[in-house]
Design a protein with these regions (language model features):
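Helix-start/capping segments and mature chain N-termini
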Residues: 2-217
Length: 217
């Protein structure tokens, strides 16, 4: 939704609200190799903004400058993705993804008080974990816990479920995607492709004109 026209100035209340929906083919956001083998991440020097500055739980385009700065820093340093810390130094999220760690078989995520986006894919992982008999624990995660975790993975609509194999040049676990990450990755793929009957209500079929399908092929 946007209030991008109608009035000049910083008060948008008299501007009309429009909704724009764009759809296009998109491959693996962090690369097919990253999705299969894991990505290399770096803890960014840019902190995630706090709730007293903006609304971190909301997906608003104006808030992405924070993430853009972290992403640019990370890519220039030779890594695939950034991990951002909250204002108190605890783990918050990736530049465009939520983050989870696995320790002793337990799935742990930062709490919403760590300025995390209330992501749809994050909620999906909660439900898929519950379906498989697991729970997701929300608690503060210290930066140092990233380095000693058995597994780390990220989630997002674009990224889907992506393993993290290195953080700040430290190998995570075995250096390969772990069993919990793989299980959730497979469940996510099954859910979004309609292969889990109980989760078909998550999907909305979209009719693609035959001409568009022919053009893609």
């Amino acid at each position: 939704a946007t209030r991008g026209y109608g009035v000049m100035g910083l008060n948008p209340l008299d501007a009309p609200v429009d909704v724009i929906i764009a759809v296009w083919p998109w491959g693996a956001y962090l690369g097919e190799a990253g999705k299969q083998d894991g990505i290399r991440a770096q803890v960014s020097s840019w902190r995630r903004f706090g709730g007293d500055t903006l609304i971190p739980h909301a997906k608003a385009s104006g808030q992405y400058l924070n993430s853009i700065l972290a992403k640019i820093e990370t890519v220039r340093a030779g890594y695939d993705e950034a991990i951002m810390l909250a204002q108190d130094g605890s783990v918050s999220e990736g530049s465009g993804e939520n983050i989870f760690v696995v320790m002793g078989g337990r799935i742990i995520e930062p709490p919403q008080t760590a300025s995390v986006l209330d992501g749809i894919s994050r909620r999906t992982i909660h439900q898929l974990a519950a379906d498989s008999g697991r729970t997701v624990e929300s608690r503060s995660i210290a930066r140092s816990e990233l380095y000693i975790a058995d597994e780390v993975f990220m989630t997002g609509t674009a990224a889907e479920v992506v393993p993290v194999r290195e953080i700040d040049d430290r190998v995570i676990g075995s250096g390969q995607p772990g069993p919990v990450t793989r299980e959730l990755q497979e469940l996510y793929e099954d859910a979004v492709h309609g292969r889990i009957e109980a989760r078909r209500d998550w999907l909305d079929p979209v009719e693609v004109p035959a001409a568009d399908l022919a053009a893609e092929s």
